Amino acid sequence: MTLLLDTTIPRTLDVLLARFAQRPATRVEAWLFEDEAARREAEAVLAGSGTEARLYSAYKPLLHHFLETVAPARPRRVTVRTPAGDFARFRLEAYPLAALLPDTALSFVPGELPLAYEVDLDGQVQRVFVPHRAGAQGGSCGWLRVWEGEALVEDGPLETEFEQAYQAVMAAVGAHAWPAAAPYFGTLQIEVETGGIERRLPWQDECLSTREALHEEFYFAILAGFQQRAGKPDGDRTLQPGQIVPLLRAGSGDTHVRVSVLPLAPAAPEPAPASVPVPAEAAPGGLAAAIAPLTPAQADAAMAALGGEPFLHASTQGRPVRGAYFAGAGPALVVTGGQHANETSGVVGALRAAQALKQRGAHFAVVASENPDGAALHQRLRQDHARHMLHAARYTALGDDLEARQAPPYGEKGARLEAIARTSARLHLSLHGYPAHEWTRPLNGYVPHGFSQWTIPKGFFLILRYHAGLDGTAFLDTLTARLAADPELAAFNAAQLAVWDAHAGELPFAARHGIPCMLMEDHRSTVPFTLVTEFPDQTVYGAAFRLAHTTHMRTVLHAAELLQEGWLS
């Protein structure tokens, strides 16, 4: 192990309390990455020492303003003028306000104030300060205002522990002498124990979490740094830097940060599939009851139990990547799940679909869990943060997107390639998910770079890729009509699309029968048609998880029927 950083950062709130206990001010306003309870307690302490204080959230300040002061009043009409500049960003930063005010006529219009929202509540106008740094990134930041008598003597950014932890990690990673070429490390582990905001919201799976935001900042910023180091283009998915693992833990008081480089670790030995005690939800016929992601061992056992002609490949860390081929009748298809391992419902959907296709005597191959190393990391991270997106588990243990591998050794991708070769499939169904609650990068422009279309949920949607000269429009129109016949899915999509419209505006691609659909000519696969399913499944459990994998399964089965009927001939 190589230690890059081991440091402690004082809690900004405690620093302020100590400062104004020693020398009280007339009035203080501060914006911090702290939850409401901690801020209110600190206000009382400051008042006791002679300082009038009001402490606000630096993260999503307009939303917190409504949660903490406006929502109980239930206004009938609200008009929000966003800060000058990036209208789309500041409208998104207010999400999911539209869902939390269902009986309120809410509208957003571009404003002119540089660092504030202007909010009209039934004719009463309020200003809500929005601390963020100038420049292209426009990151959220702490802020401090201090009055001595009537004089404002301090008014500017306050570097909080949230920001300092991020900067310390990025500086340590940037200063290290890395190898000249990838892979740069086995595992780059970032351990942070810190306080902050962790608040569930009363709208579907929405939550506010500064620790989740730090996870996302660390993972994507570090990955982008190594892409630049390697001379890769923006958004590249081929680089294999190693596995980046942010470990965020809840703490109180000071923030502790530790960054270390570890060798690539092989997977711990797992029992043979036949000896795994498979729970009822992973047993054939019982997957319909699944309300949570399967473990890698459970998914492997369920794949082994399918039958058919098995084939086996190995992951980077040595885990089995299992496939099964069924030489049935009719045109062939391939079904895969778990390419991105934090998108968990597709694994169950693929297994359920495979069971049904087998009973129908269909011609197909299935690889239900393509990325077991990522799944193992997701299982590990989920122990601490079951409701976080955990994008560090998205890619393989080498740090790349397995679909992007274009040359041997193919590793995990070998199972997909064998499934395609065995079937000569005309259609590949790749079952995916995306965040079920808002995805933010508050220190780097707020909206995740390269993922602006994925930042808030827009319901279940489809992406159809096709080779030049082909047309899947009629297929997609018929498929969505059949899928929309499920009233639960239809209601789910309608609710999410209404909130999307309020906070993001027009969809980036048209909806068919209430299901957004993207069509694109694409040649990344040898299969003529690739249908990607996208359900907002990251972090969901219970009935929402069941709807997710049921929708994946229904999509596969309806698509197989349409393929059989000649809609993709």
Which residue stretches match the model-derived regions?
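Conserved catalytic motifs of the protein kinase core domain
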Residues: 330-332, 528
